[in-house]
Amino acid sequence: ANGNIASVLQSTKGINVLSPTWFYLNDNSGGIASLASSSYVDYCHQNGIEVWALVSNLENPDVNAESILSHTSTRDNLTNALISAAIQYDLDGINVDFEALNVDAVGTSFIQFIRELSIKCANNGIVLSVDNYVPSAYTSFYNRAEQARFADYVVLMAYDEHYAGSEEAGSVASIDYVTKGVEDTLQDVPAEQLILGMPFYTRVWSETPIDGDGSTGETDNVVDYALSS
């Protein structure tokens, strides 16, 4: 995918930041695996585009993200690895995309990780952004207000209102869902720090009657929207 950057940018306009998924948790000591590319970064910089590399916790099922975040030594290993990679590849920023964390296991450790990473980012001129679900009771431990104190930007993932596991078919991101997500996030995050994440895909649903009782089962296919000018 790194090699397609030129063709992708040729058919788009108005982009000032790209956030490729380049890093993921690779072991329980806080090490990361990397897909980063210097030529990708160079090409973006030549075209006036910043690169905020994304770090994910979802790619390696053998890694316990909650355990890494809950120990000072492994958090330190992780933050150091990210800063080292950012310097090596001349990255403009780091985007943290840690999803599906277990609140009982992680507690306040996630926000402590953001605090510690933010200090190292600031010391090295690296922009820090953090991805977030739409506000709800079960995601309150992500602590968006505290994120806004330390991160440069808080990113709202305003999509997956309905998904493959939903009990009913529906929109990926209806206007009411997105509006409420933005309004609720703005209660904790200053507007100038909020980035709205919109989906470039939709879901095509089909309903199948179940046992003739009037109920239905839903299945979906994801269809990407092509970026174009």
Located regions from the model:
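Hydrophobic faces of well-ordered beta-strands that scaffold small-molecule active sites
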Residues: 1, 16-20, 51-55, 94-96, ...
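Glycan-recognition patch characteristic of GH18 chitinases/ENGases
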Residues: 1-81
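Electropositive, surface-exposed helix/loop patches at the edges of structured domains
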Residues: 6-9, 85-98, 170-177, 196
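Structural recognition of alpha->loop->beta junctions
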Residues: 13-17, 70-98, 142-162
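Substrate-binding surface in catalytic domains of secreted glycosidases
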Residues: 27-35, 80, 103, 107-228
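Helix C-cap/helix->beta junction micro-motif
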Residues: 47, 89, 123-126
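Substrate-binding clefts and substrate-entry loops adjacent to catalytic sites
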Residues: 56-66, 94, 159-166
